[in-house]
Amino acid sequence: MNAANVSCQTLIDTLRRTTARHPDKLAIKQHDQCWTYQDFYQRCTRVAGGLSELGIKPGDRVAILSRNSSTFALARYAVAAMGGVLVPVNFMLNANEAAYILNHCEARLLLVGKDELSNAQQLSALCPAIEHMVWMGSEEGLATPEKMTPFADLLSGDALVATDSLDAALPAQIIYTSGTESAPKGAVLSHAAIIWQYASCLVDAEITVSDVHLHSMPLYHCAQLDAFLGPSVQVGGSNIITDDPSPENLLALLESESISTFFAPPTIWIALLNSPMFAKTDLSALRKGYYGAAIMPVEIMKKIQQSIPQIRLWNLYGQTEIAPVATILQPEDQLRKPGSAGKPVLNVESRIIDDVGNDVAVGEIGEVVHRSPQLLSEYFKDPERTAQAFDGGWFHSGDLATIDDEGYITIVDRKKDMIKTGGENVSGREVEEAIYQLPDIAEVAVIGLPHPRWIEAVTAVVVTQAGESLTEELVIDHCATILAGFKVPKKILFVDELPRNPSGKILKRDLRDTHANVFDS
């Protein structure tokens, strides 16, 4: 290794250094499969060698379509070790939606989880650039389907770590955002950006070597992958992985594994509190609770703190493009600043600006912009959107917010009407375009409305063509045939007209105010 590379810090370096410090400590566990850091590191380097033997080169995109598993975590570091670029794909997307991502990023290899066989078989016809499909189910004793390579084959080669040739500024992953346009954007994140974000989480979210994490939210999301799994591995924590987010399974694992650290959107926390098992579960080990993707209702927060008196809560706000954590509301501020996103984390600088780029006054609404080494390098193959996002030298988040006299940021709206439902991002425009395919539709506006379970529920407000009748069931069934399940509206509201401003723009905020109580009953 030459002197120029001695200080190089890539994702595989974080695992290698942890392994040197804690070789025999539990790193990854799922069901009865337990790996120490030494086991985990050795497996990662062997899989890296296996990928290279298949012809995957540094810079190639390696996609993964899988639910949570220990093999997912293994693939994450193996791809990094050989210089590949990981592209996690949301397993809830339908085949056409997933194919767009795979074709756009020009993935050469697709890692397929045990529950995604049907989708993968459709993708083989839709994505001609994919040269190899690797069956992760072989790690759980499942027979390998025809035309797929068993994951076990990747473990049979020589170990490979391309640290000497890796540059921390090179891409480590591309995560596709649920953009406000119909086509998602691929956020390219370098090794360095992700590791800068790890540092922010280690400091501001107080992630430590003694933590035992339960990873139940999807690892295809950068929240679970990069705000919790990655920082935990870097510092040497223990990581329990599950693909079953049901309240009963989560409560059982929280008790049996003595989980100390748990992240979930408010919808999951609410489901845990409402489970008949909750009162019977020993949660005495649970010291740190994290939430994000939506605001935690104050009454729910109080109930969590009353039911688990030793727990401390953090609210994490951010987005894929900043790897992902931008601000954190600390435990001592949860009830003092309810609804706030907190203050910028260690390696992020944030402002709230008006339309001409000036800081807004205290209490005034403006757009959140960031400057940080955590930020994406670019939107993949999209220089125009990249330039727009960094207009003025700051990254434009698209979120509207206020800032108070203590510097606390509160998100008040999403500039482009993104809906966050159950922790998933949904583009209102994408759902609108699906509904507009129905011939009886005159106008439609898709909004998120408060919901006791989903926090925000996708809701379509529809105006039909004159003289036409349309049922809620028909619209929902139509959407279900062309959209992923989490994007399908929970309710269709029929109205005579949509509110507009003087320039003719639909006033979605007025719609949200008018129909705010639809899901109360």
Residues covered by each model-derived region:
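Conserved AMP-binding/adenylation subdomain of ANL enzymes
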Residues: 195-212, 220-260, 275
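A short helix-loop-beta submotif of the ANL/AMP-binding
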Residues: 61, 67-95, 103-109, 211-212, ...
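Conserved AMP-binding/adenylate-forming core of the ANL superfamily
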Residues: 3-11, 16, 24-69, 73-77, ...
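Conserved AMP-binding A3 loop
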Residues: 36-38, 172-196
